[in-house]
């Protein structure tokens, strides 16, 4: 009888962790490439934070990182737009978040402009 009680308590403990939320699906460290219509791709890292319902972050975080000026998310379509003032010109990333249930395979895919440059991008959560 005692063993059954312990088994039930352990199962309840595991089920509680399954119900726990992991946070905002856009939050985290993302890496990927900006691929212009002509020319070679540039590797980029994004660091996104979520606090009080707002998204903030930086592009290529670190010593030479650039703070995002605006991040918007349309939760109905999971379309996210990121704006950042890069030295090459204003960066605007517009794309969709996908694989939201995955811890390791979430993607952010779309198109971008940076100054006069236009192209596609694909980021994956790290």
For each of these PLM feature ranges, what is it?
Residues 21-126:
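Central antiparallel beta-sheet cores of small beta-barrel/beta-sandwich binding domains
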Residues 1-9:
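Bacterial N-terminal signal peptides that target proteins for export
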